[in-house]
Curated annotation (Swiss-Prot):
GN (gene name): hemA
PROSITE patterns the record matches: GLUTR (PS00747)
InterPro entries per record: 4pyrrol_synth_GluRdtase, 4pyrrol_synth_GluRdtase_dimer, 4pyrrol_synth_GluRdtase_N, GluRdtase_CS, GluRdtase_dimer_dom_sf, GluRdtase_N_sf, NAD(P)-bd_dom_sf, Shikm_DH/Glu-tRNA_Rdtase
Region described as Disordered: spans on this chain: 420-442
The protein's Enzyme Commission number: 1.2.1.70
Active-site residues, as the UniProt record annotates them: C50 (nucleophile)
Keywords per UniProt: Chlorophyll biosynthesis, NADP, Oxidoreductase, Porphyrin biosynthesis
Free-text comment about domains: Possesses an unusual extended V-shaped dimeric structure with each monomer consisting of three distinct domains arranged along a curved 'spinal' alpha-helix. The N-terminal catalytic domain specifically recognizes the glutamate moiety of the substrate. The second domain is the NADPH-binding domain, and the third C-terminal domain is responsible for dimerization.
Physiological role: Catalyzes the NADPH-dependent reduction of glutamyl-tRNA(Glu) to glutamate 1-semialdehyde (GSA).
Protein name: Glutamyl-tRNA reductase
Gene3D superfamilies: Glutamyl-tRNA reductase, N-terminal domain (3.30.460.30), NAD(P)-binding Rossmann-like Domain (3.40.50.720)
Homology family: Belongs to the glutamyl-tRNA reductase family.
């Protein structure tokens, strides 16, 4: 068995590549089933966000398993090898474990310490359980990742403050508006006519940050107007107007700052649409959707400034230095949790020996109990038989508790192997070829 992660992120691929590999939630079940159907993939889970697509898997064989996942990504994206493979990374065993813990803690995010990624890791975990694509190994690892993400945020200040893709998008708008005014700093958005396209989680975060940065009147554009109206009720201090996507052209014409965050598979704003609209003022577009909601040719339209998630790096670099020390504190916690998982993983090597030991003792218990009860004849009531059976089971558990704990305990691998061999000799346990297979896979 071999643990690996294969994927890409904002660190390895531009948004035009990432959007080709993005997997919508309603397609995740099919994708998980497709991966699990491959003979090399024993367990698998998918993390798909605006900044990364990563597949965590337990594989029969490292090279063949990784190749199977690369083939899946190529087929899913429709990209030719020269356009895809340079952007993919593959990490194995300890590096894969460390990477997932860093991702869950927000240490690998574009916005260092952002909190939304932990929710996305939780969703990956839940979907893996719901669709039965994960087994005991990934179940334990994903559980550890969620715990680590929570621990980092509770034991350090890395997650404090407004750190998310949405907050960075609002800060980018502040920065660009300030630069228009000759100010190299974040300015209030109180003079901007603002619209937000979308009414999901990201749109909610956008409204929160826009409100804190001075915006007071905002239009929410959404395919379902009722959903936009529900969102608007949560912001009583904002003047929010809601409308459908059929009013998008009017909003492009009347607003000066427009954010997009929808789940659309194709751009909803492009040059052709913008060229057909008459505007009297500059229009700034900030797209945090992946796949992108705004076509790259929108920036070619006169009087239009267009930014996507890759442009958020400018804001990130302004804030990263102040958070690096907090990140170093978090790395210490990650090392502890990584070692805890590795200790558990290494302890699995002793499981076959422990199981055979328990099976052998259970057979002896049953045989001796049967002899004793047969000698007692009908003198024992059913209740008394149950008490004696519980007694013998309790004795076996007590006797085996020490050896079981010793075999599972964190220790050098050779020491564990010596202990397993000693248990086999002492209790005359049968051998198991699977033990050697597991040892070879380590």
């Amino acid at each position: 068995m071999h643990l690996a992660v294969v994927g890409l992120s904002h660190r390895t691929a531009p948004v035009e590549v990432r959007e080709r590999l993005s997997i919508p939630e309603h397609h995740l079940e099919t994708s998980l089933q497709s991966l699990r159907s491959h003979e090399q993939v024993l367990e698998t889970s998918i993390l798909s966000t605006c900044n990364r697509l990563e597949i965590y898997s337990l594989l029969r064989h490292p090279e063949d398993g990784v190749e199977a996942i690369r083939d899946f990504l190529a087929n899913h994206s429709g990209l030719a090898d020269p356009d895809l493979q340079p952007h993919l990374f593959a990490l194995h065993h300890e590096e894969a474990i460390q990477h997932l813990l860093r991702v869950s803690a927000g240490l690998d995010s574009l916005v260092l310490g952002e909190g939304q990624i932990l929710s996305q890791v939780k969703k990956m975990y839940r979907l893996g359980q719901d669709h039965k694509s994960i087994g005991p190994i990934l179940n334990r690892l994903l559980n550890q990742a969620v715990s680590t993400g929570k621990r980092v945020r509770s034991e350090t200040n890395l997650g404090s403050g407004a750190v998310s893709i949405s907050s960075a998008a609002v800060e980018l708008a502040q920065l660009k508006v300030g630069q228009e005014q000759g100010v190299d700093d974040l300015v209030s958005l109180s003079q901007e006519k603002v619209a937000v396209v979308g009414a999901g989680r990201m749109a909610r975060l956008l409204l929160q940050h826009l409100q804190s940065k001075g915006a007071r009147s905002i239009t929410v554009v959404n395919r379902t107007v009722a959903k936009a109206e529900v969102l608007a009720k949560d912001f009583p201090d904002l003047v929010i107007t809601c409308c459908g996507l059929d009013q998008l052209d009017a909003q492009l014409a009347s607003n000066t700052l427009l954010f997009t965050s929808t789940g659309a598979d194709e751009p909803i704003i492009d040059r052709q649409r913008l060229d057909a609209i008459t505007r009297q003022a500059r229009l700034m577009l900030v797209d945090i959707g992946v796949p992108r909601n705004i076509s790259s040719d929108a920036a070619d339209v006169s009087g239009t400034l267009s930014y996507d998630v890759d442009d958020l790096q400018e804001v990130v670099e302004r804030n990263v230095a102040a958070r690096q020390q907090l990140a170093q504190q978090a790395e210490v916690l990650l090392d502890e949790d990584r070692q805890a998982f590795l200790d558990w993983w290494d302890g699995l090597e002793a499981v076959p020996t422990i199981n055979r030991m328990r099976q052998q003792f259970e057979e002896i218990r049953k045989q001796e109990l049967l002899k004793a009860l047969s000698r007692m004849g009908s003198d024992f009531s059913q209740r008394e038989k149950q008490v004696v059976e519980a007694l013998t089971k309790g004795l076996i558990n007590k006797i085996l508790h020490g050896p079981t704990t010793a075999l599972r305990a964190p220790q050098p691998r050779q020491q564990r192997l010596d202990s397993m061999a000693a248990a086999q000799r002492l209790f005359d346990l049968p051998g198991d070829d699977a033990d050697r297979d597991r040892s070879d896979a380590k």
